[in-house]
Amino acid sequence: MKLIKNIILGTFALTGSLAVTSCSGLLDTENLYEANLDSYYSNKTEIDLAMSGVYNSMFVDGVLSEEHLIASLFSDLLLAGGGPDDTNSQNLDAFLSNTEDIHVDLWKETYNGVYCANAVIEAIPNADFTADFTSEDDIEDYMNSSLGEAYFMRAFYMFRAAKIFGGMPLIPTTDADREVARATIPETYQFIATDLLKAIEYLPEENINSISLNDYGHANIWVAKSFLARVYMYYTGYMTNIEKIATDELPYDEGSVTKSDVIAHLEDVINNSGHGLVSDFRNLWPYSYVNESNSIYNPDYVAGDAILPWAADNNLAWVGQDGIHSTLGTGNNEVIFALRFGLGNWDYDGGTGQKYSNRMPLYMGVRDHSMIPFGQGWGWCSVHPTFYNGWSDTDTRKAGSVLTLGDADQGTGSWVAGKSNQETTLMNKKYTTLQHNGDDGVLGMFYYIYNMNNADPMQLWAAQDFYYMRYADVLLMHSELTETADGLNKVRERAGLEATAYSLEAIKTERMYEFAFEGVRWFDLVRWGDVETSNNYYSSPITVSNAGVEASYSVTYRAETKGLSAIPQSEIRLSNGIYSQNPGW
């Protein structure tokens, strides 16, 4: 019996048309910055529609504009992989670019999102909510919550872009001059920090157990506090270790955020949010559900059969991806903020609807193979074998993060070498294609879970959320800032490891293993300055297979880039000389 008929993604659901058209008149039109806001967003219905537009810019069209994929290719833990035609990803992995606009969609969606957030921030004080609520208190609560979300998302977009491009043009209002120079890095982060503090001021302090399923995925105060810590640590680290301007403060409009301020915010998350660690790290990832899904949807299922024996042997059970009240699994209290993906459709959003499905499993899936339960992908981002070989087998995260090819216990016994470049027999298990048999044949697990109906499912069926922030990060950030081992050892205990004394090196090692392939490692290396030291896997020669031909390869970093990528050349031309290209590009 089919238990799940559709996917719930909150009010910005992508299975319908709301999010795709949600900034109508504002997104992707010639009048993007010229709409008359006096006639827009005057009541709750219109504000909710506008808020969908704010979140919609989390999705970008070009896959090499995905923050987490850029970070994966820049990371020392992953190789480019792929096939002979995947030159753009292979050049990025080598810190080269032969495409002048490789990240242009990230730049565009940053300012689409900023504009929509500006529109909400400006409209709310003038909107009339008397027909929508029965009391002034309810109106005030709604206004504050909506303002808090808009301020957070504006900060989120600017931070996402600043980590890739550095200083960004600041557009604080809908009618602000857009022909402005890029702000400095301190000015950009001052803008981000100010917005995060406003979000914290406006958002209600609500335990996650009281957040409804329909509201899951929206920003809340715990999201804002957690991201304030991440922004603080990235900014102070970048300025100190890359720019060589030592600082332990994050500027905002009325002063500076200090380390003690950030620690207090993290302790509020730890003590009051309701977030926690799920009991088994491996249950965070959808492969922990593939046996159960197969038992539900496969008409030929025989009781006791497991298509992923390793998961059955370890009694894995997915916690789901819809928060504490997840529609599947036991409930996920660890994920604090996620990019909520649905089932893509080529017809959405002017033919760019693939972006509404998670392309990481597609691009990082095993190339040119269709196995059960690990299906076909493009073979990007093979795992660095030196990193893997140095990882203790007693750490449950090792087998929980890395897919070993040619291993029957892992469901990859039929794998044949020589299908992709930079093969290492090791792939990302957290984000990979999952499939099994069902009424419609061997198709994606999410195809069956969410009752997909699409003519091109293989490229569109990865409805797996991308985790931007987990509670484990809160614990490890707190340990790093306080220089104490409590949070560190809670994370280690879950992984089956013994307690250890605090040291920065212990934190670095733990973060490397805990967040492998989650788009975190690269930014950690940058903020610690470890991109410029030997404390990484760059320039470590390894043997790989390129379509069956053995070769030597080493992951590359170029220090002259200062940890940044190239801004789109088209934006430099459009600026008429106001913008200049980043160093090293």
Protein language model annotation of sequence segments:
Residues 145, 152, 167, 219-226, ...:
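Extracellular structured ligand-interaction cores
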Residues 383-469:
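Flexible, polar/acidic helix-loop-strand segments at domain edges
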Residues 131-140, 167-186, 238-264:
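Short coil/linker segments at helix-helix boundaries
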Residues 3, 16-45, 192, 229, ...:
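Bacterial Sec-dependent N-terminal signal peptides
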Residues 2-10:
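Bacterial N-terminal signal peptides that target proteins for export
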Residues 22-26, 110-113, 185, 193, ...:
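Long, intrinsically disordered, low-complexity segments
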